[in-house]
């Protein structure tokens, strides 16, 4: 299932890993539909892809809203006639100790990190089942494999993504959907995740981590491309990437 001519939706595409992945896939011949909430950054990202000769379009989308994600998939199909891959990458990480009771931040993480992935699956699955082909890629985190102080809700959402994707893989095989799945468990990469952290001590620690040992988001983009490029009868079910310097 080579990347060239595949129609790929990338959420969280205005910056970081999503933007790097959209750029690489676009330059590799995919038809990329970028989605995020920041229209200015989406326009810039699409322009960069087109300058390199790639095909790309964008749609402002809040992945926490089911109807907007369904509209995103409909838009991709109207633009390019089909949908082959969705990369559920949008995420937030406003970490703080549970004792701070930042319930609005809890709700937002659950809505974007977990329900956003579920909304993406819901929107594409009928199309994938009908065409007997498709690929769901979702960003979890090493916080989906471990637990960390000050990251209780974030860890819970990323463990949830892990569970969703594992069940989707098994149900795809059991129901003969022929839908491939890939879950990314990512360590420290240079992204904007720390910008939403309101706890000063945690924000400073994460920013220092990213600044000192954070890896290039393009490395994740290369891994995503590799997973898509594999033959259709094979799923790269899990990819774990740490910065080499990360404990």
Predicted regions, residues:
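C-terminal helical subdomain
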Residues: 179, 183-184, 203-247
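Conserved glycine-rich cofactor-binding loop
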Residues: 14-15
């Amino acid at each position: 299932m080579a990347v060239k001519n595949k129609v790929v939706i990338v959420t969280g595409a205005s910056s970081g890993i999503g933007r790097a992945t959209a750029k690489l896939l676009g330059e590799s011949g995919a038809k990329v539909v970028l989605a995020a909430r920041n229209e200015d950054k989406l326009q810039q990202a699409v322009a960069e892809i087109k300058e390199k000769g790639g095909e790309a379009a964008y749609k402002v989308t809040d992945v926490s809203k089911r109807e907007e994600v369904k509209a995103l998939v409909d838009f991709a199909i109207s633009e390019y006639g089909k949908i082959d891959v969705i990369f559920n990458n949008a995420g937030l990480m406003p970490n703080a100790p549970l004792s701070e009771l930042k319930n609005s931040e809890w709700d937002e993480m659950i809505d974007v990190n977990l329900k956003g992935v579920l909304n993406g699956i819901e929107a594409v699955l009928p199309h994938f089942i009908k065409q007997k082909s498709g690929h769901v890629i979702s960003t979890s985190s090493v916080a989906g494999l471990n637990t960390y102080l000050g990251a209780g809700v974030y860890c819970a959402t990323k463990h949830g993504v892990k569970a969703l994707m594992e069940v989707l893989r098994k149900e795809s095989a059991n129901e003969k959907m022929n839908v491939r799945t890939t879950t990314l468990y990512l360590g420290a990469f240079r992204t904007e995740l720390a910008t939403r952290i309101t706890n000063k001590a945690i924000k400073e620690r994460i920013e220092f981590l990213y600044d000192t040992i954070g890896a290039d988001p393009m490395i994740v983009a290369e891994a995503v491309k590799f997973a898509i490029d594999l033959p259709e009868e094979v799923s790269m079910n899990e990819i774990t990437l740490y910065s080499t310097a990360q404990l």
